[in-house]
Amino acid sequence: MASLQLLRGPFLCVLLWAFCVPGARAQEHGAGVHHGSVGLDKSTVHDQEHIMEHLEGVINQPEAEMSPQELQLHYFKMHDYDGNSLLDGLELSTAITHVHKEEGSEQVPPMSEDELISIIDGVLRDDDKNNDGYIDYAEFAKSLQ
């Protein structure tokens, strides 16, 4: 339970999310959660190569021309599956659990449902400033500061 107290940190800041598990090396896109920190990893949100992989065929702007703010916006839109410009609990869940395996890395054990719920609750509690149950882009961007 004490480790769940650490999940109250700001949404995208631990960062994004610290991706270190003792004895294992893995990277999760969209989440710096390795069972102890919460938020989206800033390095993931700003990872041009990863974002461009997901946006291949969607946008034609060269990645070298994208500002950090444009990368943030594209990252947000990548996880806004219903296109309502808000991230709900389910969209946050998929962002948190979106795992990218690196060659030669060990697989991180899956997060329990209770851990995932606690993280999402913490994100909404800390970053949903208007208490509407969603993270809008302004709240998302502020959580990355």
UniProtKB/Swiss-Prot annotation:
It is found in: Endoplasmic reticulum-Golgi intermediate compartment; Endoplasmic reticulum; Golgi apparatus. Ca(2+) 2 binds at residues 128, 130, 132, 134, 139. Gene3D superfamilies: EF-hand. Residues 67-102, 115-145 form the EF-hand domain. Ca(2+) 1 binds at residues 80, 82, 84, 91. One of its GO terms (cellular component) is endoplasmic reticulum-Golgi intermediate compartment. GO terms for biological process: carboxylic acid metabolic process; protein transport; vesicle-mediated transport. This is Multiple coagulation factor deficiency protein 2 homolog.
